[in-house]
Amino acid sequence: MSDRMKLKGLLAFCLLFLSSFVLAEVNQKEFSVQNSPHLPSRDTIYFEDGRDYFSYKEPIEQASRTDKKIRIQFFFDYDCRVCSSAQDILELYSQIRTYKVALEQYPIATADNQFSARIFYTLQALSAGELSNVLLFETSEKSRYTELSTSNKIQQWAEEQGLDKQLFIQTENSQSVKEQIQNAIELTEEYGVFTYPYVVIGGKYVLTASTLYNDDYSVAVLDFLVNKIEQEQKQ
């Protein structure tokens, strides 16, 4: 495990409770049970619903991927202290289980907060999606997010990353980006996203910051859930 991931994992552990209530206005989906999160022992091979992960009472209907891989949907916000750390864990997992899972990223958006979706889809449209990861890491610090969340500063930041400022502004205000923002709002509501990071596995199971702060623990829980879905699909 790299020093960068260790440091970010420690930061995530210290701050994971700070993001627990951030999307209170959004309707939260009902989960099957609720328990307190914990870090299990090394010998733990079974994980408990409501403690290590959550499950939707009614799974989200999803179209099957043509490659048959299980979706891992990562809902994030740039105003998040632990999302970059969680992303590192998820990317690691998707690399070691590339034959089983597909990692998909979705910016969280509400009617009152569209910054993350607007910037994410602007970067995607400019073929600069990798800069989203850079921004997510930078804004792990609240002060940096506060600074960059203003129009002038984020445009200046984009220019510093090598993008054409005027093209960035034009794309940011384009109809296609506006439509993607609306889709993000609808998806945030459909999945009942109420905090960040918020990770949905196969439309059935959910991980939050209470699990996504330790790579060994997170990978073990992800393996447990992916294997669980595979067994359910065989029934």
UniProtKB/Swiss-Prot annotation:
Choose any GO biological process term that the UniProt entry carries and state it: cellular response to antibiotic
Identify the InterPro entries for this entry.
DsbA/DsbL, Thiol_disulfide_DsbA, Thioredoxin-like_sf
Mind telling me which SUPFAM superfamilies this protein's record contains? Thioredoxin-like
Superkingdom assignment: Bacteria
GO CC annotations, alphabetized = outer membrane-bounded periplasmic space
Chain ranges passing through the membrane: none
Entry keyword set: Signal
Show which residues constitute the signal peptide: 1-24
Q: Offer an example of a GO molecular function term for this protein.
A: protein-disulfide reductase activity
PANTHER family assigned:
THIOL:DISULFIDE INTERCHANGE PROTEIN DSBA
| Entry protein name | Uncharacterized protein HI_1215
What is the species of this protein?
Answer: Haemophilus influenzae (strain ATCC 51907 / DSM 11121 / KW20 / Rd)
Q: Tell me the lineage of the source organism.
A: Bacteria, Pseudomonadati, Pseudomonadota, Gammaproteobacteria, Pasteurellales
